[in-house]
Amino acid sequence: MKITLLGTGGPRPDPKRMGPSTLVRVGFDNLVFDAGRGVAARLVQAGVPITDYAYVFLTHLHFDHAGGLADLLFAAWNMARNKTIHVYGPKGTEAMVRYLFEAYERDIWYRLSETVLTHEKLVDIRNMVEVHDVGAGLVVEGDDWRVTAADVDHGHGLGLSRDEWTCLAYRVESKGKTVVISGDAVYSPSL
């Protein structure tokens, strides 16, 4: 298991720090946790081709943690990726990705139409991305790894319940090694 911090910045742009994102390499799989600003470029800088990841896990749906998701998905698609990308996140993730596809519907149509001239093998991105709203418990298992989620409290003293503002931490286990990744969180017994 190899961990790479792709971005550790916050919601305010900083030329020295990209938005929150962590890459966990487990065997031949690249797992991306959070998709903050600049995640696609940082993934490539880390030596991972933009077409060589299959799993994205969002801790919560603040723009600084999920704002780079469109770039991550569309950049891989535009490079003729044709394998499924799985996106996991708290309640609302499915709706967010659906809205992204609606917002870029004309662009999707344009690029698919363009393949008649370029002869590229571009599949419809809407058929390439599987999105899963998840909660606490087992999220997904790979060949030699598994990811589970726990509900955590975001904090900031806003008084929002976990039902009103769902935040997740993820636990990656592989071959006796474990790493826990959380986005914004205050002390949470589940963590």
Regions flagged by a language model, labelled:
Residues 1-180:
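Binuclear metal-dependent hydrolase catalytic cores
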